[in-house]
């Protein structure tokens, strides 16, 4: 996005005076004022049907023509936003709220405890460690030193088993591409090792500290690094002190270009376990290799793609897996790799009536993280499967960042909910004592001023959908409150009740925040996911519309006072919802959305989403995709709600051309004075690693725009 001085209060004082007029945007008297987006006669034929794509030229991201379009759209949007006083009000709240220290849940290696910390002034959090039983902290990495604007971020770390070396990854300008480096933790200096073109990969160390496994792709074509398709991932071993060109190729399948690799070294150091995935499909295969053996071949333990299997740990030749095979809510099984036929598998922890999300091995116990109506519970089991107890941890919220080790009795995690900021806890399994070790302070936030509750409402087909609703206690529920409705609904991802300063800023301004836990997510296991994927995707949009209708019927707000927000798959949700039910919303905020459902699989990692969306090359899938694809369902000469589309130039997850094309077509179709704007951030990607100031600017612009539209309606 354009650069602006966030501390220039004079600009906002002038803007406030201008807003006295009913026609609050002085330069926006006509739809003709939008920057021109030319139409080109481009079309494809899908299954005998001609599909026109007049803005295909915007997919050429680096062309002079596209760059000129971006510049003019940003200038137009900035001119509009500069005259909205609510932006400054939101910015002030966020500046204050984020001007305070934050830290992460610690993780342990040997006697060192590592954690991220930000004093509130830094653009990026720094990595520190403390020695056990010592109070002195030591700085390990400061990503703020890597760029003047804070746009080079730390995107992954992995400590060697002896805690002497750190493999760390940096990402430039929000890209998913990672460059791995190695730091000596004693000297604080980097070795010469450098690994390029890694993506969707961690670093998994051998127990002898000699090196680590990682996944990488071939170097993309120059100039196409942010848009070329990512296939044929390969698994390598990097030996410390050697060049990347000498790294050993451990596994690759040229015959399976869409397979990806997740490597885990067993705690006893005897096995390399390979999670073999296909895109974002929750199902996976399991291969393993016996390390330090003469035969380096992989054994296909689970060769078929039939369910999810996540390696938890092992005891000798018995491997434990979390799986949803014949158990949509999840269970734990044991497989003897010397007797691996499925009829010999043993169930250790059976499926419960609520969703099992993760299983951890600690001090000879299994720690199971369940979601019960979207709130976290941790249950302790013997390795034989005998239930011991449900841990006495905070309730009615989200437990996140669970950190422990198989040989440790310490468990670290954080807890929060929509009106309780993050608190970090340590639980000692040896004496079953829970201790708070850090609490987030949010200036301006007072928990007693707010209320939050969970309600259930019926969707179009009668399914009960949970939703959290939060707001100031003293507001009157008179159908006149600015309402922010957020949703996602996809890829088995649960949206948990975590505290968010952006939601706090909305509530502080007198608004209501509602977060709907739509089908397609992981809140209630794999069946919940399947009810919102592929040919069932319309259920997600129906769930979202029903959430808005419920909130309107129960006094929280009304259509003209309701804004919807979603990002990525949630951006698709907002795009489809505003086109299907424009009558329900007074403003919309689609962020980094998947808007062209016929070409999403043509760029970077988009092909991987076919497991949730289907493929436009398949006729049956095409019929479903074309029916809801936001870009293809914009109707000419229609009055759509005020909309602020947001994306980033360096988003190589959901490439920005999705939003560019959607904005161009929406602006051409709009038949009334409701603005259709696009805000295009520079030096940023899909969201991860965005520096603090850019985050504040982004939220302020979005929520300030939305508040202004809703209060003007």
Identify the function of each model-found stretch.
Residues 1-6:
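Conserved small/polar residues in nucleotide/adenosyl-binding loops
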Residues 14-19, 23-410, 416-422, 427, ...:
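Beta-propeller folds
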Residues 116, 322, 369, 414, ...:
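Short hydrophobic segments within beta-strands
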Residues 118, 277, 416, 486-490, ...:
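Glycine-rich His-Gly loop
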Residues 133-134, 173-175, 185-188, 206-209, ...:
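Secondary-structure transition/capping motifs at alpha-helix termini
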Residues 144-157, 170-175, 189-192, 429-431, ...:
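Cap/lid segment of the alpha/beta-hydrolase catalytic domain
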Residues 341, 382-384, 389, 403-409, ...:
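Extracellular/periplasmic ectodomains of large secreted or surface enzymes and adhesion receptors
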Residues 515-713:
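Active-site-proximal cap/loop segments of hydrolase catalytic domains
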């Amino acid at each position: 996005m354009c650069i602006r001085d966030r501390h220039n209060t004079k600009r906002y004082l002038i803007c406030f005076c201008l807003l006295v007029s009913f026609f609050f945007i002085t330069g926006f008297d006509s739809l003709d004022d939008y920057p021109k987006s030319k139409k080109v006669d481009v079309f494809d034929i899908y299954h005998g049907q001609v599909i026109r794509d007049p803005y295909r030229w915007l997919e050429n991201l680096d062309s002079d023509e596209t760059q000129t379009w971006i510049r003019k759209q940003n200038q137009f949007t900035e001119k509009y936003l500069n005259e909205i006083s609510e932006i400054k009000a939101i910015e002030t709240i966020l500046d204050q709220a984020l001007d305070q220290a934050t830290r992460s849940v610690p993780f342990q290696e040997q006697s060192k405890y590592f954690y991220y910390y930000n004093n509130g002034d830094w653009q990026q959090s720094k990595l520190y460690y403390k020695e056990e039983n010592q109070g002195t902290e030591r700085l390990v990495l400061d990503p703020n030193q890597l760029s003047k604007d804070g746009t080079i971020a730390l995107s992954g770390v992995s400590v060697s088993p002896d805690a002497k070396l750190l493999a760390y990854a940096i990402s430039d300008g929000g890209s998913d591409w990672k460059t791995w480096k190695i730091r000596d933790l004693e000297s604080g200096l980097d070795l010469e090792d450098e690994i390029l073109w890694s993506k969707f990969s961690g670093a998994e160390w051998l127990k002898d500290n000699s090196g680590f496994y990682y996944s990488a792709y071939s170097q993309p074509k120059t100039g196409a690094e942010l848009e070329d398709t990512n296939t044929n991932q390969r698994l390598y071993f990097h030996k410390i002190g050697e060049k990347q060109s000498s790294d050993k190729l451990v596994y690759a399948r040229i015959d399976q270009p869409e397979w990806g690799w997740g490597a885990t070294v067993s705690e006893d150091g005897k096995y390399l376990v390979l999670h073999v995935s296909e895109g974002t499909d929750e199902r996976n295969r399991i291969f393993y290799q016996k390390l330090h053996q003469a035969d380096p071949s992989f054994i296909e333990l689970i060769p078929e793609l039939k369910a999810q299997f996540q390696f938890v740990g092992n005891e000798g030749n018995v491997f434990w897996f979390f799986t949803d095979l014949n158990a949509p809510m999840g269970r734990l099984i044991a497989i003897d790799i010397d007797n691996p036929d499925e009829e010999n598998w043993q169930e250790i922890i059976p499926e419960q009536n609520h969703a099992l999300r993760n299983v951890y091995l600690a001090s000879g116990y299994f720690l199971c993280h369940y979601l019960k109506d979207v709130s976290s519970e941790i249950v302790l089991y013997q390795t034989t499967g005998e239930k011991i107890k449900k841990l006495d941890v905070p309730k009615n919220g989200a437990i996140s960042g669970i950190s422990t080790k198989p040989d440790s009795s310490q468990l670290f995690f954080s807890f929060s909910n929509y009106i309780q900021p993050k608190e970090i806890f340590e639980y000692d399994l040896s004496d079953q004592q829970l201790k708070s070790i850090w609490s987030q302070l949010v200036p301006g936030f007072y928990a007693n001023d707010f209320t939050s509750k969970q309600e259930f409402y019926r969707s179009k087909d009668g399914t009960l959908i949970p939703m959290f609703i939060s707001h100031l206690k003293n507001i009157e529920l008179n159908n006149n409150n600015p309402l922010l409705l957020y949703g996602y609904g996809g890829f088995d991802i649960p949206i948990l009740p975590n505290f968010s300063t952006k939601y706090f800023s909305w509530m502080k301004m007198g608004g209501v925040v509602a977060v709907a836990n739509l089908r397609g997510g992981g809140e209630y296991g794999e069946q919940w996911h399947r009810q919102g994927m592929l040919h069932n995707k319309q259920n997600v949009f129906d769930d979202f519309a029903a959430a808005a209708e419920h909130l309107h019927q129960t006094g929280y707000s009304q259509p003209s006072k309701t804004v919807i927000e979603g990002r990525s798959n949630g951006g698709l949700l907002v795009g489809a919802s505003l086109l299907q039910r424009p009558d329900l919303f007074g403003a919309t905020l689609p962020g980094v959305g998947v808007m062209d459902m016929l070409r999403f699989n043509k760029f970077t990692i988009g092909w991987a989403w076919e497991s949730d969306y289907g493929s436009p090359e398949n006729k049956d899938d095409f019929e479903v995709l074309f029916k809801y694809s936001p870009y293809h369902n914009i109707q000419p000469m229609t009055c759509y709600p005020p909309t602020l589309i947001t994306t980033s130039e360096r988003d190589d997850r959901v490439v920005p051309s999705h939003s560019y094309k959607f904005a161009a077509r929406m602006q051409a179709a709009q038949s009334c004075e409701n603005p259709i704007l696009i805000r295009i951030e520079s030096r940023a990607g899909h969201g991860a690693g965005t520096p603090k100031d850019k985050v504040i600017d982004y939220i302020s612009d979005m929520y300030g725009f939305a508040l202004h539209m809703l209060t003007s309606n």
